[in-house]
Amino acid sequence: MKNYSKKNSVLIIKFGGLGDFILSVEPFYSIRQHHKNENLILLTEKFYSEIAQKTGWFEKIITINRSLFYLSDKRQIKKKINLSDIKKVYDLQTSRRSSSYFNLFNEDNIEWSG
């Protein structure tokens, strides 16, 4: 994992099953190639952090414990991610839950894809 510095960062959201996560490796790589000069931050579950770390594509991997209530997820995200560092979000999960995170990032006019 590269050194993380505060500059424009790109956040990738990916949860789901193991197979689903593995299928996201190619999109991770494509995003890394497209954003060579930005810090990539992955928001995922603890189970996937080791796999993601081994790719070497992320400057930072942030894990949350997803709860039954989206509000708890949002609190964890706000606590762990400095939203002012994020310039773009790729929501590779595209679920109702991850889509609900959009409002967190919309406050700072962050570009959202997904």
Predicted regions, residues:
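Catalytic machinery of carbohydrate-active enzymes
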Residues: 1-114
